[in-house]
């Protein structure tokens, strides 16, 4: 799905920078002090610059235990430090430093997407949207949820075509 989206976006003339979090080796944040004042690990400097540069972000991940994989969450915690995603304001709400950007969240899962939305309330995706992306000023945020259970080849081909269309539109 990531290939379908990024290849179509590049073919449509968009400048695509891919960050494959699973290929990165970085330490997890362990204290509030590390989050607030610690240095960004060297291996995350370029990915962080790529995020700051991009006007549209696409996050694609598998659903693990109802939410994003821990490594992806650890990456976001490192990247979304004060001064990158928001700036604290002692007199009110933090200043949103990522305003003007948009995002698409693409999630694959081993259950029907309708069940994740209806029964589980899509809490992992909603939490990501509200507590990180929206809070930092990113909007609009669109989501695409794909339940791989019972998906035949025809349905999977439609999903890849959908990703290509999103890529072509830069959506």
Protein language model features and the residues they cover:
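N-terminal beta-loop-helix "entrance" segment that forms/cooperates
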Residues: 18-40, 156
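Helix-loop-strand module that forms the ligand-binding subsite of alpha/beta enzymes
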Residues: 39-129
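N-terminal beta1-alpha1 ligand-phosphate binding loop
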Residues: 1-14, 19
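Glycine-rich phosphate/pyrophosphate-binding loop and the adjoining helix
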Residues: 118-171
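Anion (oxyanion) recognition and catalysis
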Residues: 10, 52, 134
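Hydrophobic/aromatic beta-strand patches that form the interior of the parallel beta-sheet core
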Residues: 17-19, 58, 104-107, 141-144
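Generic structural signal for helix capping and beta-alpha/helix-loop junctions
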Residues: 25-26, 68, 113, 150
């Amino acid at each position: 799905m990531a290939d379908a989206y990024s290849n179509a976006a590049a073919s449509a003339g968009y400048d695509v920078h891919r960050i494959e979090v699973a290929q990165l080796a970085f330490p997890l944040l362990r204290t509030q002090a590390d989050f607030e004042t610690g240095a960004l690990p060297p291996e995350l400097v370029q990915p962080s610059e790529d995020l700051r540069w991009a006007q549209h972000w696409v996050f694609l991940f598998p659903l693990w235990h109802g939410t994003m994989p821990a490594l992806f969450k650890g990456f976001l915690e490192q990247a979304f430090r004060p001064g990158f995603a928001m700036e604290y304001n002692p007199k009110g709400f933090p200043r949103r430093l990522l305003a003007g950007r948009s995002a698409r969240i693409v999630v694959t899962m081993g259950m029907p997407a309708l069940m994740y939305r209806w029964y589980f309330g899509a809490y992992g995706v909603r939490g990501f949207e509200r507590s990180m992306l929206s809070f930092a000023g990113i909007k609009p945020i669109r989501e695409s949820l794909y339940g791989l259970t019972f998906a035949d080849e025809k349905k999977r081909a439609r999903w890849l075509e959908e990703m290509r269309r999103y890529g072509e539109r830069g959506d």
